[in-house]
Amino acid sequence: MRHFVVFLYMFLALSIPTAFAKKHIVTKKGNHQDITNDNEGENAEKKSATVAGAVIAGGELALKILTKILYEIGKIDRKIAIGVDNESGLKWTALNTYYKSGASDVTLPYEVENSKALLYTARKSKGPVARGAVGVLAYKMSSGNTLAVMFSVPFDYNLYSNWWNVKIYDGEKKADEKMYNELYNNNNPIKPSTWEKRDLGKDGLKLRGFMTSNGDAKLVIHIEKS
């Protein structure tokens, strides 16, 4: 009996610290997972600031931002990343997007305050279809007028090339086929690969913008006070 008590004492002396040590390790592991999750949350917040459908500080808008969000679309033959910087002194509220061809996987950012920039993407329709990413988006400005941005990334570069355009319409006007046709055919559409500057003729605003010429297109536009 005496030997059994000694044995039991030695067994407990060895087992209890080990048990506590194991428990301590598990606790550390749990904390590490929590920290990892917190970091993932922080990364998600940082990521959300540079994904399509988001609004970022206007000063952050650059082609490298558009390259990043374009990559997120994946391997699609015709796609475009659009960034529009609001330096108009006005607040913009989204109206809608009209597509001549293609679609988008994100929602047009609803509100764009002054000194902010919206990020948006479009792509050709999924599947083996000979279509491009072509359309126009519209925002109502706090002046009461509408800002329209046309973009065209065609499928057939033997017949067409990338084009873009911007116009301010009187009053509230949703994007539709008529608006698209006017901006594409009758309002001096802008060619890619060179910086364009143009007075917009209303609300004392002008534009400065650039579009790349390939099928993975990037379009950056700054709307500024004249």
Swiss-Prot record:
SUPFAM superfamilies recorded: Cytolysin/lectin
Report the locations given in the UniProt record. Secreted; Nematocyst; Target cell membrane
State the organism named in the record. Answer: Phyllodiscus semoni (Night anemone)
Record-given protein name: DELTA-alicitoxin-Pse1b
Q: Where is this site: Important in the initial contact with the lipid membrane?
A: Y160
Q: Which family is it part of?
A: Belongs to the actinoporin family. Sea anemone subfamily.
Q: What does this protein do?
A: Pore-forming protein that forms cations-selective hydrophilic pores of around 1 nm and causes cytolysis. Pore formation is a multi-step process that involves specific recognition of membrane sphingomyelin (but neither cholesterol nor phosphatidylcholine) using aromatic rich region and adjacent phosphocholine (POC) binding site, firm binding to the membrane (mainly driven by hydrophobic interactions) accompanied by the transfer of the N-terminal region to the lipid-water interface and finally pore formation after oligomerization of monomers.
Record propeptide residues: 22-45
